[in-house]
Amino acid sequence: MSQEFDYIIVGAGSAGNTLATRLTEDEGVTVLLLEAGGPDYRFDFRTQMPAALAFPLQGRRYNWAYETDPEPHMDGRRMECGRGKGLGGSSLINGMCYIRGNAMDYDGWAKLPGLEDWSYLDCLPYFRKAETRDIGPNDYHGGDGPVSVTTPKAGNNPLFHAMVEAGVQAGYPRTEDLNGYQQEGFGPMDRTVTPNGRRASTARGYLDVAKKRSTLTIVTHALTDKVLFEGKRAVGVRYLVGAAEERVEARARKEVIVCSGAIASPQLLQRSGVGPAKLLESLDIPVVHDLPGVGENLQDHLELYLQYACTQPVSLYPSLLWYNQPAIGAEWLFNGTGIGASNQFEAGGFIRTRPEFEWPNIQYHFLPVAINYNGSNGVKEHGFQAHMGSMRSPSRGRVQVKSKDPRQHPSILFNYMATEQDWQEFRDGIRLTREIMQQPALDAFRGREISPGIEVQTDEQLDKFIREHAETAFHPSCSCKMGTDDMAVVDGEGRVHGMQGLRVVDASIMPIITTGNLNAPTIMMAEKIADKIRGRQPLPRSKAPYYVAGDAPVKGKAMRDVSAVAQ
């Protein structure tokens, strides 16, 4: 069985759905969109209810459920590496936090050779193009894009406001928009949720429009085996369909675009013969092109939870009790409101821990309940927590294919906490978080410190806690990086070096991870590269001003000084 299309896109995730939608806007352009997972079933509360975000991570219907190799600096733990499987990709199972990154991230990219048009003001128009924000457009936000963005509303949980106020009382800035003029500071957090309280995945925002077009063919339960080449040109793919794993070949007249994410994109390239020659030869994979950077430069965000008991009955603890959940579900299902309609990450912030950081190196998510991100180990009392993680770790990992079998997961090593900077940032972060949590704004709510526990104080004690309890923020990236150096995999338009008709477009092509969550940047990158593929002029550069810290102090004087950081 053989088919022919203009473009074949491998992976119907945050980038793939964006590209499929934009490419088929052009009359007569045909696209085959392949997805290894299934549909995004709209009646499955596990993926559609924002508050149920932990459920998809607990199974394998929507989650690839990768695990790392034993991490050498984390007591040899095999750590979670959840990735979305199904229409929407990781936007189908993520935490729905709409965070774009810091303007300085993109200005940093633009200083790299070949990436001059990736500055913040070049990228901002594409963030706006993708977005519809519920309170309307402005210089930073869009009003008619496919991605529904919801802002926190009056009357939400008082713990959100208390935690932001505590951050301000600790001496940090207040910001009204973490995606606007100034990311640095504490404030409300936007989320990818529709006006009627449903998850705004790219399957909903983009594919709901595009799938009506006869020029778009979507095949689910299609596991791509390899990219097919004639010489150095990609001419198609071979994929396995359904439980019977029927082998199908499809031809691409113009391009094969790999949008499989930071784990599966390098895995597919390597399995197809594009990657480090020594690795491929060791697995008897014929080398099509020796490209040493494929799978290297892997980055992620690591985070910790600092948990506190709540002395007032205002946390979300009752919503964890089974007998309260039917009413929560009914309100969400019929009205699109209530606890179920929010991801419950409605406040957060970004800070610098030391003057040598030019822009924030720590991110906070505040949550009005004490529980692990994947829904495990819920504290059986009222509580709240701060998720705290470093943003631009110098540690680098890698992804390596283990066989020719597309069903076998690759070898993944993030090499977390490999540098002294990592340890210093986390120690500082824990101590500064404790200072924030001791501010007067939280006096009415703050009980005992549940985790790490007030007895954990010395560097050695903190390091032990970090090794045992730090978790992924589910932000793998940078494993097929853009650039021109010897380890770059693609150019600034996603074209694979040394090949023709082959691109990679997803979080793997980031050269350096951004400051915050990765879904919004991934969609932006796909929007920007879509214009390149279509031969369109780039959107005009934005003229919006943005904050640069410069010589500004890291923080002001705390309202309540608790000698947070040991010098």
From Swiss-Prot:
Molecular function per GO: betaine-aldehyde dehydrogenase (NAD+) activity; choline dehydrogenase activity; flavin adenine dinucleotide binding
Pfam families with a match to the protein in the record: GMC_oxred_C, GMC_oxred_N
Top enzyme class: oxidoreductase
EC number(s) recorded for this UniProt protein: 1.1.99.1, 1.2.1.8
GO biological process, one term: glycine betaine biosynthetic process from choline
Cofactor dependence: FAD
SUPFAM superfamilies, alphabetized: FAD-linked reductases, C-terminal domain, FAD/NAD(P)-binding domain
Entry-linked InterPro entries: BetA, FAD/NAD-bd_sf, GMC_OxRdtase, GMC_OxRdtase_N, GMC_OxRtase_C
Keyword Flavoprotein applies: yes
UniProt keyword list: FAD, Flavoprotein, NAD, Oxidoreductase
Function: Involved in the biosynthesis of the osmoprotectant glycine betaine. Catalyzes the oxidation of choline to betaine aldehyde and betaine aldehyde to glycine betaine at the same rate.
Name listed for the protein in its UniProt record: Oxygen-dependent choline dehydrogenase
Gene this protein is translated from: betA
